[in-house]
Amino acid sequence: MPRSLKKGPFIDDHLLKKVVKAQESGDRKVIQTWSRRSTIIPEMVGLTFAVHNGRKFIPVFVTENMVGHKLGEFSPTRTYYGHAADKKSKAKR
């Protein structure tokens, strides 16, 4: 169920302060954040965020196509190695 339009997009206050500060100073430094739940707003376009995935920080450069999505969507938390293959089928090849 999507968020109510009258509430507006959710963004953590501390992250919003960092975004405003980066926009005012014109600084292109990477903004480190643990806030995966924050929605990407148009003011974030062009900035780079280091989003924590539980183990390390993944750099995410925000583009116009990402507006409306969450920061956590672009920082995967699980590593997929593929399904286990049968040893017999590998031996035949």
UniProtKB/Swiss-Prot annotation:
Alphabetically list the UniProt keywords.
Answer: Ribonucleoprotein, Ribosomal protein, RNA-binding, rRNA-binding
**Which GO terms of type biological process are on file?**
ribosomal small subunit assembly; translation
Q: Name one GO cellular component term.
A: small ribosomal subunit
Q: Output the superkingdom of the source species.
A: Bacteria
Q: MF terms per GO, please? A: rRNA binding; structural constituent of ribosome
Which PROSITE patterns does this chain map to? RIBOSOMAL_S19
The record ties this protein, via InterPro entries, to: Ribosomal_uS19, Ribosomal_uS19_bac-type, Ribosomal_uS19_CS, Ribosomal_uS19_SF
Indicate the family of this protein: Belongs to the universal ribosomal protein uS19 family.
Which NCBIfam families does the UniProt record give? rpsS_bact
- UniProt cross-references to PANTHER family, sorted A to Z: RIBOSOMAL PROTEIN S19P FAMILY MEMBER, SMALL RIBOSOMAL SUBUNIT PROTEIN US19M
Role summary: Protein S19 forms a complex with S13 that binds strongly to the 16S ribosomal RNA.
Report what the protein is called: Small ribosomal subunit protein uS19
